Amino acid sequence: MDYFLIGIGGACGSIVRYKIGDIISKRTKSKFPWGTFIINITGAFLLGIITKSGAGKNLSMILADGFLGAYTTFSTFMYEGFNLFENKKKLNALIYILSSIIIGILGFYMGEFISQL
């Protein structure tokens, strides 16, 4: 049953990630990977909410492990950061990587804080 719940959440999370990433990339003309950045930050924020919300085991598996596991994308984050470095956009790469980490941590803490209100 655990794998089924995680699989359902994961399928939904990957579809939502693809759609949001597609919408963002069509609306921005920047070389900066805004889609992945926004997805990862909102994913960290939502994970903060879920971890402190007192969600039961099954709901947590669907949302945290499944949905957010597929929604956020560390491999794409690394790929885009590396490509910025490789394409001689070192400052953009540095800003992207550091801001993703710092704002991601802040987003997680904000999510935890909001869930306790």
UniProtKB/Swiss-Prot annotation:
For molecular function, the Gene Ontology terms on record are: fluoride channel activity; metal ion binding
Q: Relay the activity regulation note.
A: Na(+) is not transported, but it plays an essential structural role and its presence is essential for fluoride channel function.
* One GO cellular component, as annotated: plasma membrane
List the membrane topology term(s).
Answer: Multi-pass membrane protein
Q: Where in the cell is it found?
A: Cell membrane
Catalytic activity, per the record?
fluoride(in) = fluoride(out)
**Annotated signal sequence range:** none
Identify the residues that bind Na(+): 69, 72
Q: Which UniProt keywords apply?
A: Cell membrane, Ion channel, Ion transport, Membrane, Metal-binding, Sodium, Transmembrane, Transmembrane helix, Transport
> What protein is this chain from?
Fluoride-specific ion channel FluC 2
> Whose protein is this, by species?
Clostridium acetobutylicum (strain ATCC 824 / DSM 792 / JCM 1419 / IAM 19013 / LMG 5710 / NBRC 13948 / NRRL B-527 / VKM B-1787 / 2291 / W)
Q: What is the lineage of its organism?
A: Bacteria, Bacillati, Bacillota, Clostridia, Eubacteriales
Designated gene of the protein: fluC2
